[in-house]
A protein has these predicted regions:
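Concave beta-strand-loop units of leucine-rich repeat
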Residues: 25-32, 53-58, 81-85, 96-99, ...
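LRR N-terminal entry segment and analogous cap-like coil->beta motifs
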Residues: 1-68, 82
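Short, solvent-exposed loop/turn at the beta-strand->alpha-helix junction
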Residues: 5-10, 30-38, 58-65, 85-92, ...
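C-terminal capping region of solenoid repeat domains
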Residues: 1-7, 11-16, 22, 132, ...
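C-terminal capping segment of individual leucine-rich repeats
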Residues: 18, 42-45, 69-72, 96-99, ...
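Intrinsically disordered, low-complexity repeat tracts enriched in Pro/Ser/Thr
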Residues: 30, 43, 73, 104-106, ...
């Protein structure tokens, strides 16, 4: 695992960066990878976690599946996963896990989510509280944009970022 800005093990990072009340953990640019996220998913200190920032951590679908299956991290309101390696399978794991039923903010900017991942988010019966969704610089294309535009789940969405995600002019009109 490449750790250019971090030499600490994830256990130490939790102690350093978990807010005093235990609701916010900011580990952006710590390069914890899937192994680190698997540790977080089992970490009892994170029982009250509401905001998790894992931007730029070399996380793949494997790590997202661990988070989706966590019996500890079940109350997240904000999930930052920008600039990782998450594909449709990771988006589907988020869309299908009751752990994310309180989410009002998801940042998946600059990952590898395609139309199937966008469709999974759009059709999720779990992500009903979502207010902000960032799928910019992925590859959702017109098909994914259409699913997002027609979604009943995302009816309360206030912000949708999808620039640089492979939409044609026709796809943009759907939104």
């Amino acid at each position: 695992m490449n750790k250019p800005f971090n030499d600490d093990p994830v256990e130490v990072l939790v102690k350093k960066f978990l807010s005093r009340n235990g609701t916010v953990l900011d580990l952006r640019l710590k390069y914890i990878g899937d192994e680190g996220l698997e540790y977080l998913a089992k970490c009892p200190e994170l029982i009250d976690l509401e905001v998790l920032n894992l931007g730029r951590n070399e996380i793949t679908d494997k790590g997202v599946r661990a988070l989706a299956g966590s019996s500890i991290i079940t109350n997240l309101k904000e999930l930052h996963l920008e600039k990782n390696e998450i594909s449709d399978a990771g988006a589907k794991a988020i869309a299908g896990s009751a752990n994310f039923s309180y989410l009002n903010f998801i940042n998946l900017w600059k990952n590898k989510v395609g139309a199937e991942g966008a469709k999974a988010i759009a059709s999720s019966t779990i992500l009903v509280n979502l207010k902000s969704l960032d799928l910019a610089q992925n590859n959702i294309g017109d098909e994914g944009a259409k699913a997002l535009a027609e979604s009943n789940t995302l009816a309360g969405l206030e912000l949708l970022e999808i620039f640089g995600s492979g939409l044609t002019d026709e796809g943009k009109k759907q939104l």
